[in-house]
């Protein structure tokens, strides 16, 4: 999380880029495995919500009233029944204060507020949703069928967010560089482990484990394969063959959800053949 001033300033800039209406950002929800409370998948907040509100927590909604300038965060505090499945969690009001938001409320209050503002004829700005929970929520709240929400999303808000997030702040660049440092270690680990006789699965696990050693996650499932001609080929239970080239496409996501994403190709036995080296050099020169 960045400073309170960072999020306050970002929201002020956004208000200046959208003419009128109410802007909403949803943090997203935990993803259950086999029953609702069994959510051991790592929670990943929506990136645009995170950019403007910063709190890493599921089930939140950030709201910006463009005309009045009022900003609010809505969500439900963790109750006694939930605490047995989680570590103690700060109240939403306490968390909101850290990102410069004074007004908070329950998630039901958010739903009631949005319905009331829509009934007044105000435009509700939202970005194209990509998670089914958010699609169903928008359908129930705004009356927009889930198959029509991409078209109904606010073009004005999309352009404003793209304009802001396309230019990285110094602190964001530092976060990306942190992720790239671990990404480098992931790829060198692949080159060390990726020898003839071991499986692609094994090397893929080594690469993924390199990110997890630092308490981070991979930014996407590791791609490691002798068949680089197949786009996004995941590692298989195939032994790496002597003389083959191995493609590794991998990266990590740090604790602030900034990512690295590198692709490298290396010879399994540590040495290029003459033909491999010539082709590799041509591709490298074209890239550079």
Question: Where in this protein do the model-derived segments appear?
Answer:
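Active-site neighborhoods and metal-handling regions in enzymes and metal-associated proteins
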Residues: 1-288
């Amino acid at each position: 999380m960045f400073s309170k001033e960072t999020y306050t300033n970002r929201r002020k800039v956004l208000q200046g880029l959208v003419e009128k209406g109410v802007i909403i950002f949803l943090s997203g929800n935990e993803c259950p495995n086999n029953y609702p409370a069994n959510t051991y998948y790592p929670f990943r907040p929506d990136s645009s919500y995170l950019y403007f509100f910063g709190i890493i927590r599921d089930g939140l909604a950030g709201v910006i009233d463009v005309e009045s300038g009022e900003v609010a965060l809505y969500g439900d505090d963790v109750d006694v029944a939930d605490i047995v499945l989680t570590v103690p969690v700060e109240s939403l009001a306490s968390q909101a204060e850290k990102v410069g938001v004074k007004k908070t409320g329950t998630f039901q209050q958010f739903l009631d507020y949005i319905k009331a503002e829509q009934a007044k004829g105000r435009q509700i700005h939202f970005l194209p949703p990509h998670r089914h929970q958010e699609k169903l929520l928008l359908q129930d709240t705004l009356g927009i069928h889930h198959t029509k929400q991409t078209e109904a999303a606010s073009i004005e808000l999309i352009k404003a967010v793209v304009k802001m997030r396309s230019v990285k702040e110094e602190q964001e660049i530092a976060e990306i560089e942190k992720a790239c440092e671990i990404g480098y270690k992931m790829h060198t680990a692949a080159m060390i482990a990726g020898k003839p006789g071991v499986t692609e699965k094994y090397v893929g696990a080594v690469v993924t484990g390199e990110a997890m050693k630092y308490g981070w996650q991979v930014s996407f499932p590791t791609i490691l394969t002798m068949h680089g001609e197949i786009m996004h080929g995941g590692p298989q239970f195939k032994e790496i063959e002597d003389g083959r080239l191995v493609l590794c496409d991998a990266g990590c996501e740090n604790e602030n959800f900034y990512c690295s994403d590198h692709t490298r190709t290396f010879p399994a036995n540590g040495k290029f053949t003459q033909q491999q080296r010539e082709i590799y050099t041509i591709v490298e020169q074209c890239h550079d």
